[in-house]
């Protein structure tokens, strides 16, 4: 019985990072818009699409999108927004005002809206 309890405990502890990763608890409930210049192109090689943008004040934002498949279904690809282009992201920023990170639900590029999390807001 101890062996089973140990295995269950190890399994539960190994799953904690995944649960922590997928939560929105570290982000504000209110929605924020950030417009910036793409400094690191869209990457769809991970659990979520990512990119970096620099706002008018010079802050570099870590932008997290939906999982790659959902992000692509919304029309966002790795080649859509070249470095230097302007994009507006809409989503939930990190609760820490000194952390420039946002989980986006939508983004606008070249006048087109891309809804990566339909129904989220």
PLM segments and residue spans:
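Short aromatic-glycine-enriched beta-strand elements
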Residues: 44-54
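Short, glycine/small-residue-enriched coil/turn segments at secondary-structure junctions
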Residues: 24-44
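Short, structured beta-strand/loop micro-motifs enriched in basic residues and often containing a Trp
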Residues: 65-73
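Sec/Tat signal peptide C-region and signal peptidase I cleavage site
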Residues: 16-20
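OB-fold/S1-family single-stranded nucleic acid-binding modules
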Residues: 94-118
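Extracytoplasmic
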Residues: 31-33, 46-48, 86, 102-104
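Positively charged n-region of N-terminal signal peptides that target proteins for export
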Residues: 1-4
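Short nucleic-acid-contacting surface segments enriched for D/E, G, S/T with interspersed K/R
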Residues: 73-89
């Amino acid at each position: 019985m101890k062996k089973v309890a140990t295995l269950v405990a190890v399994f539960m502890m190994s799953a904690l990072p995944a649960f922590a990763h997928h939560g929105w608890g570290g982000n504000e409930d209110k929605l924020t818009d950030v417009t910036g210049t793409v400094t690191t192109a869209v990457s769809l090689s991970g659990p979520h699409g990512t990119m970096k943008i620099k706002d008018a004040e010079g802050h570099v934002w870590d932008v997290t999108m939906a999982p790659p498949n959902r992000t692509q279904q919304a029309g966002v690809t790795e080649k859509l927004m070249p470095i230097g282009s302007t994009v507006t992201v809409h989503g939930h920023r990190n609760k820490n005002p000194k952390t420039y990170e946002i989980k986006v639900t939508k983004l606008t590029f070249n006048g087109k809206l891309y809804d990566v999390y339909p129904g989220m807001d």
